[in-house]
């Protein structure tokens, strides 16, 4: 197992070292607008369309670009409550953690699920339609059935910055 993680770490470090200025420029532009036409992208990064197409494909094939998404305003689609949920498991066995992670992937309200260190085991970000739907989520998911000992809800009062980009 240690050898596998060492290889993965080496490959990630190697990929980051092999990102040249053009790759970083392409990634910065795509993080602002993943739907930008190749012609426009090539103009912004001062390269040919063919080169940009090859670079984007290479960045995708290597796992640096994992997916292209549209960022949707939760309020605009009726999700008026945003909540960070700190979850403590009653059993840290990997089987139960994986079961919990599978359940989180199935839940539409859950936007992010992070395994974390410290007093809690997981941190969730979810967008709920209203308090009633959030309460239903907690009754359905944050239960002993999924080995949740306790959870803490932190309701978002205001989004000052919600950006998923990594400036390179």
Swiss-Prot record:
Disulfide bonds: none
GO CC annotation: cytosol
A Pfam family: AsnC_trans_reg
DNA-binding residues (ranges): 38-57
Record field: transmembrane: none
InterPro entries registered for this protein in UniProt: AsnC-type_HTH_dom, Dimeric_a/b-barrel, Tscrpt_reg_AsnC-like, Tscrpt_reg_AsnC/Lrp_C, Tscrpt_reg_HTH_AsnC-type_CS, WH-like_DNA-bd_sf, WH_DNA-bd_sf
GO terms (BP aspect): response to amino acid
Cross-referenced Gene3D superfamilies: 3.30.70.920, Winged helix-like DNA-binding domain superfamily/Winged helix DNA-binding domain
Top-rank taxon: Bacteria
Protein name per the record: Uncharacterized HTH-type transcriptional regulator HI_0224
Lineage, highest ranks first: Bacteria, Pseudomonadati, Pseudomonadota, Gammaproteobacteria, Pasteurellales
């Amino acid at each position: 197992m240690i050898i596998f993680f060492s290889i993965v770490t080496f490959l990630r470090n190697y990929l980051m070292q092999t990102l040249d200025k053009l790759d970083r420029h392409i990634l910065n532009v795509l993080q602002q607008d993943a739907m930008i036409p190749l012609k426009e992208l090539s103009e912004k990064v001062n390269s040919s369309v063919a080169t940009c197409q090859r670079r984007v494909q290479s960045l995708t094939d290597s796992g640096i670009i994992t997916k292209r998404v549209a960022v949707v305003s939760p309020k605009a689609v009726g999700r008026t409550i945003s909540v960070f949920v700190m979850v403590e498991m009653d059993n840290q066995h990997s089987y139960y953690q994986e079961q919990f992670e599978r359940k989180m992937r199935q839940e539409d309200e859950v936007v992010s699920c992070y395994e974390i260190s410290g007093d809690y085991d997981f941190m969730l970000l979810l967008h709920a339609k209203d308090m009633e739907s959030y309460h239903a989520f907690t009754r359905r998911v944050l239960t002993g059935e999924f080995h949740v000992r306790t959870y803490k809800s932190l309701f978002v009062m205001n989004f000052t910055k919600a950006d998923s980009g990594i400036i390179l």
